[in-house]
């Protein structure tokens, strides 16, 4: 069975956007990078941060998720179960000792519309604010990063008009609580576009309304193509959302999210697949992902030629792979 696939390597770091001119004399590395430190890849992500400390000023440990059950808001620690032999205080001390600001990320760990409904009441918003603020103060974090993607990808866009004002009220309350203690509020969201263009993007996140009260906006300028082969973060699309962001808030608040991965789409299958891969090697199946730094070796291993797309400003390559083995009917 012959598989034909298309690979598009698209890094995850976050790059700060600044409109200030660079200094010509005595140039020093500018600490313009930030990045997520996932709980599931500490052995590689933490060394990567420390090896680039001259460029990185802050990190977002991707370690927490918000839950709501039994009328109680709680924040679940994802780090400890994944790293039982290394106490959470160890990497925190290492990063603090390196002079990094620590702004952990909290994801939405609730089911469809649960967080939206929670934020629809003053009591619900205050419960969420208190839980998050307590996490920050108890651990002496420098702030918090909200990555509540369920609004965009789970709840459905028909809920956005209802959710939007509750979200804005919540962000304002959380900002006030954090700022009262000298802490920062960072927001991570998918893209938005200038509504005057007729295209809004994920407008539920209300950038214009929350801009005055947030300290960081981290834009997910990746995952442009997921289900079908295509660019991961095409330049024109990225520029459009950035132009809108800096038109409504200082550029110093805006961080550009860059993908650190590529996607491997199966575009065509010839023949009958062996039984052990028949369910996964299917044209149109969910794309596998790989680490960006492995892209060149992957292409070389298949004898593929990497091509650069001038329009999208991304690289891509296609390759063929042959699978041998018995089919489900016993044929080889």
Where on the chain are the PLM-derived regions?
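Glycan-recognition patch characteristic of GH18 chitinases/ENGases
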Residues: 25-134
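Active-site groove signature of glycoside hydrolases
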Residues: 63, 131-163, 216-229
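Substrate-binding cleft/loops of secretory-pathway carbohydrate-active enzymes
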Residues: 44-46, 190-221, 226, 262-283
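Aromatic-lined carbohydrate-recognition surfaces of secreted/lumenal glycan-active proteins
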Residues: 32-40, 171-204, 253-259
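Glycan-binding loop/region signatures in secreted carbohydrate-active enzymes
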Residues: 260-332
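An active-site-proximal structural segment forming one wall of the substrate-binding cleft
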Residues: 120-144, 166-177, 198-213
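Aromatic- and acid-rich polysaccharide-binding/catalytic face
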Residues: 52-73, 204-232
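Hydrophobic faces of well-ordered beta-strands that scaffold small-molecule active sites
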Residues: 33-35, 57-61, 102-106, 144-146, ...
């Amino acid at each position: 069975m012959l598989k034909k696939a298309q690979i598009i390597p698209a890094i995850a770091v976050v790059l700060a956007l600044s409109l200030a001119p660079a200094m010509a004399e005595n140039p020093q590395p500018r600490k313009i990078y930030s990045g997520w430190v996932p709980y599931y890849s500490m052995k590689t992500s933490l060394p990567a941060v420390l090896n680039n400390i001259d460029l990185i000023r802050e990190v977002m440990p991707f370690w927490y998720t918000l839950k709501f059950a039994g009328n109680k808001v709680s924040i679940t620690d994802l780090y400890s179960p994944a790293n039982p032999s290394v106490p959470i205080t160890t990497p925190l001390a290492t990063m603090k000792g390196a002079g990094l600001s620590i702004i952990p990320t909290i994801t939405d760990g609730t089911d469809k519309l649960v967080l939206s409904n929670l934020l629809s009441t003053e009591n619900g918003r205050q419960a969420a604010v208190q839980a998050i603020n307590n996490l920050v103060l108890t651990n002496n974090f420098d702030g918090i990063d909200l990555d509540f993607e369920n609004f965009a990808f789970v709840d459905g866009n028909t809920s956005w008009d209802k959710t939007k004002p509750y979200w804005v009220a919540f962000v304002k309350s959380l900002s006030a609580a954090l700022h009262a203690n000298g802490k920062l509020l960072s927001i991570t969201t998918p893209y938005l576009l200038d509504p005057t263009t007729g295209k809004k993007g994920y407008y539920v996140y209300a950038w214009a309304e929350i801009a005055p009260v947030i300290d960081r906006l981290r834009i997910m300028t990746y995952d442009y193509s997921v289900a079908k082969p295509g660019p991961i973060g095409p330049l024109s699309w990225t520029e459009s959302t950035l132009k809108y962001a800096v038109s409504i808030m200082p550029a110093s608040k805006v961080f550009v999210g860059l993908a650190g991965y590529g996607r491997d789409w199966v575009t065509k299958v010839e023949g009958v697949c062996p039984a052990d891969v028949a369910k996964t090697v299917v044209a149109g199946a969910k794309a596998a992902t790989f680490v960006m730094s492995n892209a060149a070796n992957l292409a070389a291993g298949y004898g593929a030629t990497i091509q650069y797309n001038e329009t999208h400003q991304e690289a891509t390559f296609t390759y063929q792979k042959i699978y041998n083995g018995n089919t489900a009917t016993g044929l080889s």
